[in-house]
């Protein structure tokens, strides 16, 4: 399994924020962080600004349906603070609502949030510890043989430095990004097809580029298939439908 260290952090957009996650491989635990506003930082809560986790109650919060952010803020809806949570099928839709002034903040994984920051002026990530959590690839119960195969293959890829290179290609230094693309191996693929379900709306984990789904997770799965002699089939679906 792939364990991903998660870090929720605040992203600012005219008084609104994102929670986000930090990628890591191994057995790291996620550290969640808080949020803040560039233009209204330090203002008291109750005026629409978000400068810390303490400011979340009573705010209008956007999340992607079924994500960690969705789970995180659900308790705020029933604590009597008047918090309203808007759930979107795509993180990008929540971001647009934020830019249009319909939300006070958006809660989303860090690396996708960083991509939104790069694409949209006025966004800023503010860090504050909030929660810890593990992420992993998921295989259906009853398929222990595949679980063992994938786990062993991931260990081999880690030991060989392949996982580190894949991560550096997307999230490394300016000198590293784009310099370590995973190259599909020319191997016999006689062991069937590995079908991977994902929501391709989370750059750099998984996203569309020139009509093809790519990203860290997809490169890892391609490397796994190369090792196992399998074809890779990627199915893009709503995040909330990946695990029914």
State each model region's role.
Residues 21-38:
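Sec-dependent signal peptide cleavage junction
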Residues 31-34, 68-85, 121, 125-129, ...:
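Ligand-binding clefts/hinges and TM-proximal coupling segments of bilobed small-molecule sensing domains
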Residues 36, 47, 60, 65-68, ...:
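Extended ligand-binding regions for polar small-molecule ligands
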Residues 12-13, 17-21:
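Hydrophobic core
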Residues 71-77, 92, 96-131, 241-244:
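A ligand-binding cleft/hinge motif common to bilobed small-molecule-binding domains
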Residues 36, 41-42, 110, 114-151, ...:
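Periplasmic-binding protein-like
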Residues 40-91, 110-114, 196-203, 213-228:
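Bilobed "Venus flytrap"/periplasmic-binding protein-like clamshell domains
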Residues 36-38, 84-87, 96, 149, ...:
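Extracytoplasmic small-molecule ligand-binding "clamshell" domains
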